[in-house]
Amino acid sequence: MAKPILRIGSRKNTRSGSRKNVRRIPKGIIHVQASFNNTIVTVTDVRGRVISWSSAGTCGFRGTRRGTPFAAQTAAGNAIRAVVDQGMQRAEVRIKGPGLGRDAALRAIRRSGILLSFVRDVTPMPHNGCRPPKKRRV
């Protein structure tokens, strides 16, 4: 019968405390990706490291309700609530995509109390690249 291999150290005791370290972030970048089906809001520091993120799907919206402006507003509020607690005062906003949640997410960001240095539209525009999807026939 084979003997079990004894482990010297236990993995449970290696890490004490939580992994997330709370650091003060005075300035950041808020990325809003608004597609027709969902809206994803990501808050990063100026170097691009993700601090907080939220989407309409993680806020509990399912199906076609994920693409609504109200879902985008809720997602933006959830993502920003965490960074306001960490002391973010100024941010720049980068909006990407053609979705309905663009304006609603921007409105929620303005209402949060963070000063916006500028709002930039970074939607990728093709120089006649891929063929677009066919028109819907309902």
Swiss-Prot record:
Molecular-function GO terms, alphabetical: rRNA binding; structural constituent of ribosome
Biased composition (Basic residues): 9-22
Region (Disordered): 1-22
GO annotations of cellular component type: chloroplast; ribonucleoprotein complex; ribosome
Entry protein name: Small ribosomal subunit protein uS11c
Gene Ontology biological-process entries: translation
HAMAP family noted in UniProt: Ribosomal_uS11
Principal location: plastid
Organism listed in the record: Arabis hirsuta (Hairy rock-cress)
Annotated localization: Plastid, Chloroplast
InterPro entries linked: Ribosomal_uS11, Ribosomal_uS11_bac-type, Ribosomal_uS11_CS, Ribosomal_uS11_sf
Superkingdom of this protein's organism: Eukaryota
This protein's UniProt keywords: Chloroplast, Plastid, Ribonucleoprotein, Ribosomal protein, RNA-binding, rRNA-binding
Family membership: Belongs to the universal ribosomal protein uS11 family.
Record's subunit section: Part of the 30S ribosomal subunit.
